[in-house]
Amino acid sequence: MPLSWLLPFSAMELLLTATIFYLVLWVVKAFRLQVPKGLKSPPGPWGWPLIGHVLTLGKNPHLALTRLSARYGDVLQIRIGSTPVVVLSGLDTIRQALVRQSDDFKGRPDLYSSTFISDGQSMIFNPDSGPVWAARRRLAQSALQSFSVASDPASVSSCYLEEHVSREAEHLVTKLLDLMAGPGCFEPSSQIVGSVANVIGAMCFGKNFPQTSEEMLQIVNTSKEFTEFASSGNPVDFFPILRYLPNPMLQQFKDFNKRFLQFLQKTVQEHYQDFDKNHVQDIASALFKHSEESPHVNGDLIPRKKIVNLVNDIFGAGFDTVTTAISWSLLYLVTKPEIQKKIHKELDAVIGRDRKPRLADRPQLPYMEAFILEVFRYSSFLPFTIPHCTTRDTILNGFYIPKDRCVFINQWQVNHDPKQWEDPFEFRPERFLLANNTAVDKTLSDKILLFGLGKRRCIGETLGRWEVFLFLAILLQQLEFSVPPGVKVDLTPVYGLTMKPPHCQHVQARPRFSK
C-alpha cells in the first residue's frame, strides 16, 4: 500500500496548515493583553492581521487619527504591524497625560530609526528617561536659555539672539533682493534655511561656526531627508523585515545623520582648541566648562564626549522648526495679502522705518503676534510630538495602559478641534486678539499645541518663538511678498516629523521703501 494512502494530507497541505496555525497563534499572542480586573483597554478599530492599521493611516496619519478620535474618543488604540500604539487627542486628555501624569508618559519608545540619530545618543529621541537624561536636559536647557538672553557688552542688541537674528535677517533681505534682480523670484525655504542655521550655529559655536561652509549648506538643505523619515508611524520602526529590503529613503536617512554628526564632531573639536573657560560666549563653551569642572558623570555632570550629542539636538531642532515656521508664514502672506497689509501698517505705526525691530517690540505688535500664533495653529507643522512611551502601568481616562506602550500625541487634532476653536479651518489671526485689539488673548494662545508638554516639552520653544518673531518683523518691515498674478500657491503640507509646505518657486519680494 503506498504511503500516501496512509496520510490524509499532502506535504503542501500540512505546511499550509502549520503556517495558518502559527499565524493564528502569532495574532492571538499579539492581541492578548492582561488587563486588571475592573479596567478596560482603550477602544479602537479592528485591524488587519500582520499589518494592523497601516492602510488606515495612509499618507496623512494625523488626519486619519483625527477621524478615528471623533469616533473612538480621546484615548484610542491602533496597531502598526503587531505593535499596539495608544493615540491621545483632546487638549484636556493630553495635559492630563503629559503634565499631571508626566512621570507615567515621559518615556520614548526604542525605535529603530532613533538608533541612527546622534549614534543613538540623542537626548530628544533616546528612550532613556532616568536621572542622567534629566540632568543633561536641564544642562542643555540652561545653556540654551543663557546664551539666548545673555548680551555682548560690545553690541547694541539686547541679547545674543537678537544680535544674531538681526544680522542674518539683514543678509537675507539683501539676498532676496539680489534674487529679484536676477531670476526675479525664489523658493522661500531654500533661502531661509541657511540664515536660520547660521543663527543657531552662532549660538552654539560663536565665531567658530563655518557659516559659508559648503558642507554645512549641503546638510541643512537636505534636512527634509531627516524630517520625512523620522515621522510618527514610519513602517521601518514597526516592520523589522523592511530594514533588510532595498530602501532608498532609509539609506538617505542614515547618510544624513552620519554627515550631520561628523560635521558637528569636527566643529566641536575645532571649537575646543580655542576654548577659554574665562571667556564663555556660546553654548558649546558653556558645556566645555561644565565638563572640565565636573568630569565624572554623576547627577548634573556630563562627559566631554557627550557634548556633541547635546549640540546635535540643539542645532538640529533649532534650524528646522524655525525654518518651517517662517516658510509657512511667507506662503500664507502671499496668499492673504490683506493680512500682510495689516502687519505692515502695525510695523509702520509702532517701529517706523528709521530703526530695526527688536525683541522688546513684541508686546507692542499684537497683530504680528496673533498672525504667528495662527500660523502655528493652522499649519500645525509638528502634527505629532516625537512618540512617547509609558514608563509604568497607568490609567488614563479610565483606560488601562501598560508599561512600555508606544503613545502618539496628536497635536494637529488639538489645533483643529471644533470644541476648542471657532471655525478651526479658517485662517484668522484676529481670533487671538482681545476685544480692544491691543493684546493677545493668552488663555486662547495657550491652547495651541506645537512644542509638546510636560517633561519632554521642547527646550528651545521660547528661543524658537522669539526667533520667528524677529525674523518676520525685520523681513516685513522692509519687504512686501507676493506671487505673480494667476499663480496658484499649493498649501498642502508634506507629512513628516515637521510638515513642510510644497516648494513654490514663484515668490517675489519688493522693497517697501528706499534706505
Swiss-Prot record:
GO terms for cellular component: endoplasmic reticulum membrane. Its cofactor is heme. It is found in: Endoplasmic reticulum membrane; Microsome membrane. GO terms for biological process: arachidonate metabolic process; cholesterol metabolic process; estrogen metabolic process; hormone biosynthetic process; progesterone metabolic process; retinol metabolic process. One of its GO terms (molecular function) is hydroperoxy icosatetraenoate dehydratase activity. It catalyses: an organic molecule + reduced [NADPH--hemoprotein reductase] + O2 = an alcohol + oxidized [NADPH--hemoprotein reductase] + H2O + H(+); 17beta-estradiol + reduced [NADPH--hemoprotein reductase] + O2 = 2-hydroxy-17beta-estradiol + oxidized [NADPH--hemoprotein reductase] + H2O + H(+); 17beta-estradiol + reduced [NADPH--hemoprotein reductase] + O2 = 4-hydroxy-17beta-estradiol + oxidized [NADPH--hemoprotein reductase] + H2O + H(+); estrone + reduced [NADPH--hemoprotein reductase] + O2 = 2-hydroxyestrone + oxidized [NADPH--hemoprotein reductase] + H2O + H(+). Its main location: endoplasmic reticulum. It is a peripheral membrane protein. Heme binds at C458. Its EC number is 1.14.14.1, 4.2.1.152. It comes from the Eukaryota. Gene3D superfamilies: Cytochrome P450. Glycans are attached at S69. Substrate binds at F226. Keywords: Endoplasmic reticulum, Fatty acid metabolism, Glycoprotein, Heme, Iron, Lipid metabolism, Lyase, Membrane, Metal-binding, Microsome, Monooxygenase, Oxidoreductase, Steroid metabolism, Sterol metabolism. Pathway: Cofactor metabolism; retinol metabolism; Steroid metabolism; cholesterol metabolism; Lipid metabolism; arachidonate metabolism. Interacts with PGRMC1; the interaction requires PGRMC1 homodimerization. Belongs to the cytochrome P450 family. A cytochrome P450 monooxygenase involved in the metabolism of various endogenous substrates, including fatty acids, steroid hormones and vitamins. Mechanistically, uses molecular oxygen inserting one oxygen atom into a substrate, and reducing the second into a water molecule, with two electrons provided by NADPH via cytochrome P450 reductase (NADPH--hemoprotein reductase). Catalyzes the hydroxylation of carbon-hydrogen bonds. Exhibits high catalytic activity for the formation of hydroxyestrogens from estrone (E1) and 17beta-estradiol (E2), namely 2-hydroxy E1 and E2. This is Cytochrome P450 1A2. It comes from Cavia porcellus. The gene is CYP1A2.
